[in-house]
Amino acid sequence: QIIDEYGEDSDEARVEVYGDFPKSGQDQFIAPHLVDDAMRRPQHKDMTAPVVIGVDPARGGADSTVIVVRRARDIVAIKRYRGDDTMTTVGHIIDAIEEYRPALTVIDEGGLGYGVLDRLTEQKYKVRGVNFGWKAKNPVMWGNKRAEMWGAMRDWLRSASLPQDRLLKADLI
């Protein structure tokens, strides 16, 4: 009956029927198996798909600036830098833009991101800022842009290809 109601691969069936541990906790937004599956999935390697770069700038402390390069469903590169000033961070982003030639570079404009975005805009790079406090496109479903983007990423992970990267996995789950 549990399998009929919830499905053979559901956490309910894993616990109640098979006596296994659930794949995810009740409060966990992204299940570990989604990330593990994406890390095992081969790259699609669609060289005609546009490249998009995402940047989460940071300065000082334990946080790192992270630059992620995506082509279609594939994450093709993750670069991390710790402790750099704003202009050095801009330099790292320019290096990634020059190497990967993205259709767009999206930057978290909270905190340090405003200065990074302003400098890259001044230098005529095609960049767009995103503020995670913005209103979601579907405010009934999502409380803000951050929640909406996490939801979109969770859906995307079902077909994505991620590199084997323990820091990425820890950030996602």
Regions found by a protein language model. Name each.
Residues Q1-V55, V69, A170-D171:
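ATPase catalytic-site recognition across NTP-hydrolyzing enzymes
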Residues Q43-H44, D56, I94, W142:
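Residues embedded in well-ordered secondary-structure elements
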Residues T48, R59-V66:
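Short, flexible loop/turn motifs enriched in small residues
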Residues G54-P57, E109:
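Generic detector of well-ordered alpha-helical packing
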Residues P57-G60, T86-M87:
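A general structural motif
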Residues R73-I173:
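Mg2+-dependent endonuclease catalytic cores in nucleic-acid-processing enzymes, primarily RNase H-like
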